[in-house]
């Protein structure tokens, strides 16, 4: 086994992209990194572990200060590669708060790297849709976010983060991030007299689009607004030429999973986020 770190996204793509595309939905995060030409890549970790024949057995990507993202080729367990990666990261002093990967791989890496000192932060169901199912629409219509939505949208963002237990969304930073979406046809509001739900095209892969930040305030839940917003945005993304859409759903929330399945999304795998203690 041989560990290799890459200094830019092009060289990483040359070795890893074909492997990652074999499970494009599962690997939508590291694939999205490849298209990013930011100067910050110099601080990233883009790496592979190759077997004795030069084939990629394990892919790793990390954009500090976020989690390490892992993928075992064809989801075939390879503890030798995982152990080597852990040793190399410790040797180079590369630190990160946790690991994000298919459930079994995340657990095996965390056991090896942290000597069992970790906890599960979240479990996400990665889902894929190739065609939107026919379903009744709720009253209202979808529209792009506007500047005058910034009086409420950052607070929805903070509430989303709190409910999903993902990260802290402070209002000034969230406002800045949302403002970047204005005029770009990526952030959408479902409006029924007043704004009632939201969904975002958060990133794209080579062939697909990822729907993120789906949120409906408690006052407007149970009326089908989220279903209508997600279904409509999903169809818009397919109409733009994407071959499929993907999203992450809380694996422990049967309500949201049920909503997405009715729209046409299907389970791909469980992704665990494990934090080191």
Which sequence ranges carry the predicted segments?
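Conserved GNAT acetyl-CoA-binding A-motif
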Residues: 93-102, 237-249
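Conserved beta-strand-loop-alpha-helix junction that forms the acyl-donor binding cleft
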Residues: 100-106, 247-257, 274-277
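Acyl-donor-binding surface of acyltransferase catalytic domains
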Residues: 63-139, 274
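Conserved acetyl-CoA-binding loop-helix of GNAT-fold acetyltransferases
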Residues: 77-88, 212-216, 222-239, 258-262
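Conserved active-site tyrosine of GNAT-family acetyltransferases
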Residues: 110, 260, 265
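Short amphipathic alpha-helix that is part of the acyltransferase structural core
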Residues: 1-29, 132-167
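Acetyl-CoA-dependent GNAT
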Residues: 61-66, 161-165, 172-212
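Conserved donor-binding loop and adjoining core beta-sheet/short helix segment
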Residues: 4-7, 18, 24, 32-92, ...
């Amino acid at each position: 086994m041989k560990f290799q770190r890459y200094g830019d996204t092009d060289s990483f793509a040359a070795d890893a992209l074909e492997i990652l595309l074999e499970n494009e939905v599962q690997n939508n995060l590291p694939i999205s990194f490849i298209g990013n030409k930011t100067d910050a890549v110099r601080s990233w970790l883009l790496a592979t572990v190759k077997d004795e024949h030069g084939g990629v057995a394990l892919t790793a990507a990390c954009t500090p200060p976020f989690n390490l993202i892992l993928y075992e080729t064809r989801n075939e367990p390879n503890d030798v590669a995982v152990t080597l990666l852990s040793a190399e990261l410790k040797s180079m002093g590369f630190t990160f708060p946790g690991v994000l990967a298919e459930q079994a791989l995340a657990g095996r890496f965390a056991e090896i790297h942290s000597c069992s000192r970790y906890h599960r932060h979240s479990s996400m169901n990665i889902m894929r849709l190739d065609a939107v199912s026919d379903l009744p629409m709720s009253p209202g219509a979808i529209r792009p976010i506007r500047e005058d939505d910034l009086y409420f949208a950052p607070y929805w963002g903070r509430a989303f983060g709190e409910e999903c237990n993902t990260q802290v969304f402070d209002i000034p930073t969230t406002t800045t991030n949302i403002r970047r979406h204005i005029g770009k046809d990526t952030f959408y509001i479902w409006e029924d007299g007043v704004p009632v739900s939201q969904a975002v095209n958060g990133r794209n892969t080579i062939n697909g689009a990822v729907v993120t930040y789906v949120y409906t305030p408690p006052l407007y839940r149970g009326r089908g607004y989220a279903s209508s917003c997600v279904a409509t945005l999903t169809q818009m993304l397919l109409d733009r030429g994407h071959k499929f859409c993907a999203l992450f759903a809380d694996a422990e929330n049967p309500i949201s999973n049920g909503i997405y399945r009715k729209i046409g999304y299907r389970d791909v795998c469980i992704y665990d986020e494990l934090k080191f203690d």
